[in-house]
Amino acid sequence: MIVVKIGGRVVKNSLDKIILDILNINDKVILVHGGGDIVTDYTKRLGIEPVFVTSPEGIRSRYTTKEELEVYIMAMSLINKSITSKLCSLGKNAIGITGVDGGLLLAERKKRIVVIDERGKKRIIEGGYTGKVKEVRSEIINHLVKLFDIIVVSPIALDVEERTPLNIDGDQAAFAISKALRANVLILLSDVEGVLVEGKVINRLTPSEAKELSKKIGPGMNRKLLMAAESVENGVNKVIIGSGVKDRPIINALELNGTVIANG
């Protein structure tokens, strides 16, 4: 079983390449998609100014109000059904779901978050409607893969305590699903060719090397490396970080082009 995460820019600019590539894969595929740029577009169209916050680690993320949560769900559902309909129209047996469906992804809402304000000072603010995955009901996917070849998953989770959907990070969703399924491979596709150090792609890292390197590279990729190391330590065979904008992006990753995090 292969888990593939495609970032928002890949969804917006290279989706057809991803879909054509999936047609040539004979394994079961769990496709987790992002879509931040598209969410921002729809937010602005509806007259809502998107708000982004920066963590003390330098990671910039969307601040999700109740109003923007509704737009997020709408946009992600549109992306999900667009991907699923294209796959089905090309003869693939696919289904599109969110992490809310069946309680696939159970999360906890972030009650408070620490941000860096416009003066460069740390400040604690109300957490909005973003969450952290706490549980994956892997039996749902295990049942679905008996019926479908491809499962397209939107990164929306269910907050059981407050009974509301939550915006969750797409990478986090993909890592959580991969660990729960003990997937053979997790592929992370974005607009970079892999982990870059001094402009060159690092081809292979062990989990311990990935953790060490995470201390020396920029925000965003450092988090990917930490989660990749944890995934391999928890039963995922390998994690591959590669380009989603080149031709044959998934096949290229399976041929180990990019950065591979694995034991040994």
Curated annotation (Swiss-Prot):
Belongs to the acetylglutamate kinase family. LysZ subfamily. NCBIfam families: argB, PRK14058.1-4. Gene3D superfamilies: Acetylglutamate kinase-like. One of its GO terms (biological process) is lysine biosynthetic process via aminoadipic acid. Substrate binds at residues 35-36, 62, 167. The keyword Cytoplasm applies. Its main location: cytoplasm. The gene is lysZ. It comes from Saccharolobus solfataricus (strain ATCC 35092 / DSM 1617 / JCM 11322 / P2). The record marks 5, 224 as: Transition state stabilizer. SUPFAM superfamilies: Carbamate kinase-like. This is [LysW]-aminoadipate/[LysW]-glutamate kinase. GO terms for cellular component: cytoplasm. The keyword Amino-acid biosynthesis applies. It is found in: Cytoplasm. Its EC number is 2.7.2.17, 2.7.2.19. Keywords: Amino-acid biosynthesis, Arginine biosynthesis, ATP-binding, Cytoplasm, Kinase, Lysine biosynthesis, Nucleotide-binding, Transferase. Pathway: Amino-acid biosynthesis; L-lysine biosynthesis via AAA pathway; L-lysine from L-alpha-aminoadipate (Thermus route): step 2/5; Amino-acid biosynthesis; L-arginine biosynthesis.
